[in-house]
């Protein structure tokens, strides 16, 4: 059963989009708005904490995780174009910080972009005449266990020929 359609969506841009490659975040906003979503980018969001946690410094990860989760409180859905960052928060924030009821409420509303679009964007009219391939994101497939949504989204784009790697 599809969850109720969210009204107020926040975009978790991630450090990568903020500092190096904004294209995926900008494209995500464009698609979400085409779906009729009101998209906000909370200015107080920070990092998911993955660099510190993966380096063995959970105490350094805690404040950025706490700040990021607090920034997203009150949104119906939080969408991120980065499976790695989504997976970090959803599956591993608990390794660095106490998960309070408020934090869990935010974590329960986090979506990786392709999961969100395949759930709520079935009526999008997507067209791209191209041959493409798709490489499973290591963290998205391992942290989130997600391999289906990206291919499902690609299958909904008219004109695409998908060649598996």
Language model features by range: what are they?
Residues 1-165:
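Iron-sulfur cluster-binding electron-transfer modules in prokaryotic oxidoreductases
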């Amino acid at each position: 059963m599809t969850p109720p359609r969210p009204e107020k969506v926040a975009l978790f841009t991630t450090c990568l989009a903020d500092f190096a490659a904004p294209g995926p975040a900008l494209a995500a906003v464009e698609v979400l708005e085409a779906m009729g979503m009101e998209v906000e980018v909370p200015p107080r969001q920070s990092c998911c904490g993955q660099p510190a946690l993966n380096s063995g410094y959970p105490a350094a990860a805690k404040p950025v995780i706490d700040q990021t989760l607090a920034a997203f409180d009150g949104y119906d859905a939080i969408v991120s174009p980065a499976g790695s960052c989504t997976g970090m928060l959803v599956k591993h924030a608990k390794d660095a910080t106490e998960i309070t009821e408020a934090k869990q409420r935010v974590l329960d509303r986090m979506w990786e972009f392709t999961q969100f679009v395949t759930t709520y964007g079935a009526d999008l009219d997507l067209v791209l005449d191209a041959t493409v391939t798709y490489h499973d994101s290591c963290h998205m497939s391992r942290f989130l266990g997600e391999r289906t949504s990206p291919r499902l989204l690609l299958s909904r784009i008219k004109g695409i020929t998908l060649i598996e790697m």
